[in-house]
């Protein structure tokens, strides 16, 4: 092949590799990712975001109390973890309304749980456990803080409403504690019962009606299959992909009015179900969590691989409001801040619950020593997630949270006169996902395309360089062949200069000498 043609081929390959594969394709790919992430009405992403077809893994672990009477007498609590009670959790966003003026949409959240015995490791929900009666203890705690003079009334009301309990612990089946409910009898006509029940009825989201004047109390029952009242407004990300999913309002308010001064009331991050793509190691994963009335951030920790896909591993915790100035607004009061990885939720949920990581992971040692049976472990009890950085797809995520009550001696309540002081764990939950093979396959298809383009880039660049080099070499080789070689003939001494045999002028210059010298 002629050098010129080889040069054209080599240059074309080189130009294709550099201009198309190396320069044009990456921006095109990024633009497509940005476009696909937007929550545009009718798009595939909008459908997945609003009604994810695959359930989340929802695991509940209860702490069984093995020495309830001894605790009542003042001894240290001994606990035994029982779980997981595994539930398939379906989350739907309902009553969606688009707001074109600011590229946002509003929705309510609906969560539904279905018990999955095949993944509950032999547990059925029929197991009888002894646990703190959260409703009784919450009533005691709130009365002490808000109306301590009413403790006498509360004593009488507890006897009537809960049928003269022997302790603040209750023996019940796991399914009753979690979803089916424990009985609350508000049929009494006495003043004490009527007064306390009127307060309980105001919190209708915590009780399920079970006939006239009768209710059922459980940890999750009232929320199961129910559209939650919070109206959440998020950005769609059509105008700016970085804004996708960001929370801007809850119930028409642009910030909370729960916490003290500072940024604690601000809505930071997304609604935790979608995140902006093209992550870097410097980006935090920030989301607003309505169940604890605050935003939380997860930070890059390491590079990982999930199901054959390269991911970024992130970790999160509850912070330390006692030592971090920007978190002090989460303190119940300026002089009553909890320490690291503990958060008082009283203002948020209306019950004196304290959030922590499971088994008090990362909390001060003194709280761990208040009870027996806790064994914190980072891998099993930490908050962690793995994101594919280009699409911000969570391939694996584990959100874990424990709920506790701070208990102590209450002289004016007969069942707690000798109670030990302790941070008492009640239960902990893990909400997680390991992305299914169907969705992983789609991701791998994208990365296979990227790999093919990457291969084409280097193949065309290397091939183009080699072909261009070969063309240049061939060109110079042919150039050398076309040179006229002149050999100098030097006659030896005494020899007569002669032309070679049969050589004439015409044979030397046949192409240069015209056949007819008189042609002109």
Curated annotation (Swiss-Prot):
Segments passing through the bilayer: 6-26, 452-472
GO cellular component, as recorded: cytoplasm; plasma membrane
GO biological process: sensory perception of smell
Residues exposed to the Extracellular side: 27-451
Keyword Transmembrane on entry: yes
Keyword Flavoprotein annotated: no
Disulfide bridge map: 264-329, 293-348, 331-337
Residues that carry a glycan: 64, 224, 268
Family note: Belongs to the CD36 family.
Full protein name: Sensory neuron membrane protein 1
Organism: Apis mellifera (Honeybee)
Lineage of the species this protein comes from: Eukaryota, Metazoa, Ecdysozoa, Arthropoda, Hexapoda
């Amino acid at each position: 092949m002629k050098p010129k043609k080889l040069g054209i081929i080599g240059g074309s390959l080189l130009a294709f590799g550099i201009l198309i594969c190396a320069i044009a394709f990456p921006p095109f790919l990024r633009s497509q990712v940005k476009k696909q992430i937007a929550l545009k009405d009718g798009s595939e992403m909008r459908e997945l975001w609003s009604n994810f077809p695959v359930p989340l893994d929802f695991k509940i672990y209860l702490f069984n109390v093995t020495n309830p009477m001894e605790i009542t007498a003042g001894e240290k609590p001994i606990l035994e973890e029982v779980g997981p009670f595994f539930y398939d959790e379906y989350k739907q966003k309902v009553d969606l309304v688009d707001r074109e003026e600011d590229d946002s949409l509003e929705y309510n959240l609906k969560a539904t749980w279905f018990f999955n015995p095949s993944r509950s490791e032999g547990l059925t929900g029929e197991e009888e456990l002894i646990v703190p009666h959260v409703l009784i203890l919450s009533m005691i705690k709130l009365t002490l803080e808000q109306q301590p003079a009413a403790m006498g009334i509360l004593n009488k009301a507890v006897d009537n409403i809960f049928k003269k309990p022997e302790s603040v612990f209750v023996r019940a089946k796991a399914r009753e504690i979690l979803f089916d409910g424990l009985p609350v009898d508000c049929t009494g006509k006495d003043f004490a019962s009527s007064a306390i029940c009127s307060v309980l009825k105001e919190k209708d989201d915590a009780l399920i009606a079970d006939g006239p004047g009768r209710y059922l109390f459980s940890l999750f029952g009232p929320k199961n299959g129910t559209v939650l009242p919070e109206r959440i407004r998020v950005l769609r990300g059509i105008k700016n992909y970085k804004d996708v999913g960001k929370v801007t309002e809850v119930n028409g308010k642009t910030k909370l009015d729960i916490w003290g001064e500072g940024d604690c009331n601000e809505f930071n991050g997304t609604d935790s179900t979608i995140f902006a793509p093209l992550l870097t190691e410097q980006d935090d994963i920030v989301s607003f969590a309505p169940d604890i009335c605050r935003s939380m951030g997860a930070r890059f920790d390491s590079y990982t691989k999930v199901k054959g896909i390269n991911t970024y591993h992130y970790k999160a915790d509850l912070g330390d409001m006692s030592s971090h100035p920007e978190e002090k607004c989460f303190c119940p009061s300026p002089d009553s801040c909890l320490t690291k990885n503990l958060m008082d939720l009283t203002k948020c949920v209306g019950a004196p619950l304290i959030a922590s990581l499971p088994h008090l992971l990362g909390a001060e040692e003194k709280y761990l020593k208040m009870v027996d049976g806790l064994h914190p472990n980072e891998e099993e009890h930490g908050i962690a997630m793995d994101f594919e950085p280009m699409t911000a797809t969570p391939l694996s995520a584990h959100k874990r949270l424990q709920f506790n009550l701070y208990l102590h001696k209450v002289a004016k309540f007969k069942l707690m006169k000798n109670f030990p002081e302790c941070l008492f764990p009640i239960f902990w939950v893990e909400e997680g996902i390991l992305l299914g093979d169907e969705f992983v396959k789609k991701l791998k298809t994208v990365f296979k395309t990227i790999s093919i383009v990457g291969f084409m880039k280097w193949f065309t660049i290397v091939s183009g360089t080699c072909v261009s080099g070969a063309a240049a070499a061939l060109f110079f080789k042919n150039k050398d062949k076309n040179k006229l070689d002149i050999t100098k003939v030097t006659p030896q001494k005494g020899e007569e200069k002669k032309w070679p045999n049969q050589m004439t002028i015409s044979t030397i210059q046949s192409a240069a000498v015209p056949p007819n010298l008189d042609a002109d």
